[in-house]
Regions:
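The feature captures the beta-strand-to-loop junction immediately N-terminal to the Walker
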Residues: 61-63
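Conserved ABC ATPase "signature" region
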Residues: 131-151, 202-203
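Helix-to-loop junction immediately C-terminal to a conserved catalytic motif
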Residues: 76
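Short coil-to-helix segment of the ABC ATPase nucleotide-binding domain corresponding to the Q-loop/switch region
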Residues: 113-122
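Conserved ABC ATPase signature
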Residues: 155-159, 163
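Conserved ABC transporter NBD signature motif
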Residues: 84-96
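Conserved signature/switch motifs of ABC ATPase nucleotide-binding domains
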Residues: 154, 175
């Protein structure tokens, strides 16, 4: 006998999932950031508005000095907007918070602590309501996810660049932030290590992609396309603004070997090249 309620239940569940995925994770509203210096006031970014949906991966791309990191720092809470506001998960950002994990290019690991303790310190400072056993389990789980459990007792100075960045990513994920901010995290890595880190990042995101929003700063067009749902192209500073937002309509999961032959990938790649480098073209 067919249960007539099942289609209704499935439809309701699908509606709930779609609604959840459409929720806004980050809202940047008319944000301007200016700094006072010896030569007067320097406006890094001006009148920027952007919404990032829950579960999205969005990259910020542009030339050096276009305000990418400044915009990222307003989301992290380390830079306060001169005008406008940034909202994360429905709350106006007043400063850094555990709902936003950050990974920098320079790893930012404590050199005197082991891999394990670097992650444990972060978990211990955020997860006040957890027991010591629960915290240890969280650290171990995240080390396993980035394949670093055998290296848990090593100091950062004993690790390669790629391994250090995996520690930094594991530390960020261990505190279970709903928003992960990546400021050129793979910029100093060689091409092979960078490629493997992309896969590691997407695996971690995929475990909780309905709840994990990622915003990343990069100079790498290929990286932006491979990882992103949308690419935000910034104009040059000062007074940098958003030049254009490019949708990346490529199915997931993505394979680096196959994706570059996809006509849509080629179209997006050419579009980003045009937006970023047209002014440097040489005419005959």
């Amino acid at each position: 006998m067919v249960n007539v309620e099942e289609p209704v239940l499935y439809a309701a569940l699908a509606t709930d999932i779609i609604t959840e995925l459409k929720q806004t994770s980050i809202e940047i509203k008319d944000v301007t950031v200016s700094f006072k210096g010896a030569k007067g006031v320097y406006t890094a970014i001006k009148d920027i508005s952007l919404e990032v949906k829950k579960g999205e991966i969005v990259t910020l791309i542009g030339h050096s000095g276009c305000g990418k990191s400044t915009l990222m720092n307003t989301i992290s809470g380390m830079v306060k907007p001169t005008r406008g506001e940034v909202i994360a998960n429905g709350n106006v950002i007043k400063g850094p918070g555990p709902d936003r994990g950050i990974v920098f290019q320079n790893y930012s690991l404590l050199p005197w602590l082991s891999v394990y303790k670097n992650i444990y310190e972060a978990v211990d400072s955020v997860m006040k309501d957890k027991t010591a056993a629960e915290k240890r389990a969280m650290v171990q789980s995240n080390l396993e996810m980035v394949n670093l459990l055998p290296h848990k007792d090593k100091l950062p100075g004993q690790l390669s660049g790629g391994m250090k960045q995996r520690v930094a990513i594991a530390r960020a994920f261990a505190i279970n932030p709903s928003i992960l901010l990546l400021d050129e995290p793979f910029g100093a890595l060689d091409a092979l290590t960078k490629g493997s880190m992309h896969i590691e990042l997407l695996k971690l995101w995929n475990l909780d992609k309905r709840n994990k929003t990622i915003v990343m700063v990069t100079h790498d067009i290929e990286e932006a396309i491979f990882l992103s749902d949308r690419v935000v192209v910034m104009n040059d500073g000062p007074e940098a603004t958003i030049k254009e937002i490019v949708n990346v309509n490529l199915p997931r999961p993505r394979n680096k070997k196959d994706i570059t032959h996809d006509p849509e990938y080629v179209r997006i790649h050419d579009k980003l090249l045009s937006l970023l480098f047209n002014k440097f073209s040489i005419e005959d």
